[in-house]
């Protein structure tokens, strides 16, 4: 008797499997936005240097005459090759001669430029706030933006190696619960990160657990379904990833502050952690690791949920051991 035969007896694709896959789909929908979150929270808006004539509230209209904002921008910031204001440079001195106004303002031929030493002004049409505008990750610091996603993926790789090994040693269920807790804490704290360094560390920890959860949902789904149903289970789980991406797009459209968006996608993880206490362990893993009593307990629970009362009553250790069951499972 192989494990798949035993699984068929307790219900290979019954109410239990449907509820299990449905829970994992909901979990994936809520988890997947964490992977691509920086597409929105790290969005780089249009920006230019802060210049006194335009952005200093103490400069009165008498100082600039009747010049428009476009005129003040023209004399304060040089143009790039596309004739648009440069994003990372400004004139050291206003270039009044560029307006072809003679005798109205002092003339100067000093066209030297300097970096944005006083900061930047951002276009907040799409997003009121992102981590880019929060910590000025532009110009010389623009490489730091990509470092956030790199750290998240590095955490995913390292977490997959460590937690993947632990899942085979101590079980899928306990590792899933641990990862849910770690992700809930790290992602929620990231919404209140006071510095960019703290934010990077928290996103690394979030990546450490996210991929492990997604991997274990696949494993548990496969280990609790029959071979003929596994392709359908995988397809449904993969579709839930796409739903998660669409959900994030809708949330990002409605929530334009990165901290609020971060907190919004993090809060449901707490609910998933609380719900994970009702998860079942893989009976296949329990039997392989000589935890026969626990394996029987989980199988009977599945049989009861699937309405297999006769199997629930006749399922014993002798039935599992019959025909060298352990050797077949391994």
Curated annotation (Swiss-Prot):
Keywords: Cell membrane, Ion transport, Lipid metabolism, Lipid transport, Membrane, Steroid metabolism, Transmembrane, Transmembrane helix, Transport. Pfam families: Sugar_tr (PF00083). The chain crosses the membrane at residues 16-36, 146-166, 178-200, 204-226, 234-254, 258-278. GO terms for cellular component: plasma membrane. It comes from the Eukaryota. It is found in: Cell membrane. The keyword Transmembrane applies. One of its GO terms (biological process) is monoatomic ion transport. It catalyses: estrone 3-sulfate(out) + glutarate(in) = estrone 3-sulfate(in) + glutarate(out); 17beta-estradiol 17-O-(beta-D-glucuronate)(out) + glutarate(in) = 17beta-estradiol 17-O-(beta-D-glucuronate)(in) + glutarate(out); taurocholate(out) + glutarate(in) = taurocholate(in) + glutarate(out); 5alpha-androstane-3alpha,17beta-diol 3-O-(beta-D-glucuronate)(out) + glutarate(in) = 5alpha-androstane-3alpha,17beta-diol 3-O-(beta-D-glucuronate)(in) + glutarate(out). GO terms for molecular function: transmembrane transporter activity. It is a multi-pass membrane protein. InterPro entries: MFS_dom, MFS_sugar_transport-like, MFS_trans_sf. PANTHER family: SOLUTE CARRIER FAMILY 22 MEMBER (PTHR24064). Belongs to the major facilitator (TC 2.A.1) superfamily. Organic cation transporter (TC 2.A.1.19) family. Renal transmembrane organic anion/dicarboxylate exchanger that participates in the reabsorption of conjugated steroids including estradiol-17beta-D-glucuronide (or 17beta-estradiol 17-O-(beta-D-glucuronate)), androstanediol glucuronide (or 5alpha-androstane-3alpha,17beta-diol 3-O-(beta-D-glucuronate)), and estrone 3-sulfate, as well as bile acids taurocholate and glycocholate, driven by an outward gradient of dicarboxylates such as glutarate or succinate. This is Steroid transmembrane transporter SLC22A24. It comes from Pongo abelii.
